[in-house]
């Protein structure tokens, strides 16, 4: 977590204020149990910036199933009447200022929730990789190549969450899949909700687009 403390002095008397953001959404209870991790966390670094009158917390999420690969993120900060900070929920929106438009194409690497039935708060023990049981954001190419990221290891029970989208008027959802697989993706509006639609997929060693009604 990135946390904060306050004091009337620069060098003493600090009082712990709480969590500003957790890179696994720990302690957030607005959409899931407070202790349930919704991403694979490790350490966290960041800072607070005011942009056009709105305060933001910058932080990072982890990618590639290791503690050493990081994705820069930002969330708006809300304050209580007494000036204390309300913990920010992880989203896919960044500095957008509201829900993303539900039309068009978005990269999978903006997923703000990523987990499976093998629950883990941490990305991996230091120096180790998360094995093939766990979904992870990755990319093709070598270090420094500008390649679009995607989610690897979307196996049975793997869940990727994207928040928030304005999907008014949306009747179809498409995904692009590559891999030796057979099954389907379920489209939901909550991690434990009922499916709004199902997208069957099949084997392919190139990216294929699949579409379903919702």
Residue ranges: model-predicted function:
Residues 1-198, 202-214:
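Carbohydrate-active catalytic/glycan-binding domains of CAZyme proteins
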């Amino acid at each position: 977590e990135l946390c904060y403390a306050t004091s009337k002095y620069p060098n003493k008397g600090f009082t712990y204020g709480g969590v500003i953001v957790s890179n696994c959404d720990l302690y957030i209870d607005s959409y899931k149990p407070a202790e349930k991790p919704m991403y694979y966390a490790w350490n966290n670094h960041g800072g607070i910036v005011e942009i056009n009158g709105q305060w933001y917390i910058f932080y990072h999420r982890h990618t590639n199933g290791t503690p050493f690969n990081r994705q820069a993120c930002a969330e708006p900060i809300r304050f209580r009447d007494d000036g204390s900070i309300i913990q920010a929920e992880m989203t896919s929106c960044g500095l957008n200022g509201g829900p993303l438009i539900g039309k068009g194409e978005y990269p999978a690497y903006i997923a703000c929730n990523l987990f499976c039935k093998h629950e883990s708060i941490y990305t991996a023990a230091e120096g180790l990789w998360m094995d093939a049981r766990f979904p992870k954001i990755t990319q093709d190419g070598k270090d420094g190549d500008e390649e679009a990221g995607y989610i690897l290891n979307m196996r049975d029970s793997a869940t990727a969450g994207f928040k928030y989208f304005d999907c008014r008027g949306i009747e179809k959802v498409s995904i692009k899949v590559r891999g030796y697989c057979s099954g389907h993706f379920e489209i939901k509006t909550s991690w434990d909700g009922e499916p709004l639609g199902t997208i069957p997929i099949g084997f392919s060693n190139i990216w294929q687009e699949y579409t379903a009604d919702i």
